[in-house]
Amino acid sequence: MFTTKHFIWIGICILFILIMNHYAKKEDFTLQNACYFFMFICLLSETTKMMSDMIPSTHGGMHLNPQSLPFHICSILLFIAAYITFGKDGPLKQKMINFFAVVGTCGGIAAILIPTYGVEFNVANVYQCFMYHATLTWFSLYLIRFKHANLGMQVFKNNLVVLFALLVFNLYMNSILAVYDTNFMFIVRPPLEGLPFLNLNHGYYIYLFRVIMLGVIGLSLFHLPFIVKERKSCETESDFNIA
């Protein structure tokens, strides 16, 4: 973590995001254009992961390593992206866009900064991890920049509820799949050893509390500028109506 190779990967990801931001603006990407591009990267990413993470089955043949099942928060966003791409317009789709924009940005950046697959240049999953999360970050920022996402107080509350529901869901999933040592959403143990804040030095429950608090604080700080802007807009509109 934060080695020379890691900084190279971070630089590649930042460059990719900047290039895609510029290209999307220059070509005036529609939401559908951006969705199709992201889904293409998702397809490549999942294909790479499946090809790399197949393991021998007990009774012959092979199966996907249960640790690679799509229950991490960034992997769950694959399904949300599919609905955004192919689903009907409406309140549900808008809620998914709102959730995706925030969690995708935070999750993508966190995954780039904490490389759980390592940073080696000769491992396929490393390429898959960095490029997927770089694209995820770009797409999430695209949703915000081009005003497809609406981020206010009510959206903050909705996103908090959904995130907590996913936390509870993965507490169950990690328990069901405990024999396979899964760690979805990193609520079993830290994503990497030796992290300064996310560690088990003070016991599991302190660690879990810190994970939850980081999620709540991160979500709150992300929404804060939009909530302030929304409130100012409401006050301005109210003053105008009075006048």
Predicted regions and their residues:
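Membrane-interface helix-boundary motifs at transmembrane edges
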Residues: 22-35, 86-96, 146-157, 232
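Membrane-embedded alpha-helical segments of multi-pass membrane proteins
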Residues: 7-15, 70-80, 100, 113, ...
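Aromatic-anchored segments of alpha-helical transmembrane domains
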Residues: 41-51, 104-115, 163-172
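Juxtamembrane "helix-exit" motif on the non-cytosolic side of transmembrane helices
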Residues: 23-24, 47-59, 112-121
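Alpha-helical transmembrane segments in multipass membrane proteins, preferentially the mid-helix core
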Residues: 16-22, 80-83, 135-154
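Membrane-interface transmembrane-helix boundary segments in multi-pass integral membrane proteins
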Residues: 1-12, 154-165, 177-219
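Non-cytosolic membrane-interface motifs at loop->transmembrane helix junctions
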Residues: 58-71, 121-131
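Membrane-proximal helix-loop-helix units in multi-pass membrane proteins
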Residues: 83-144
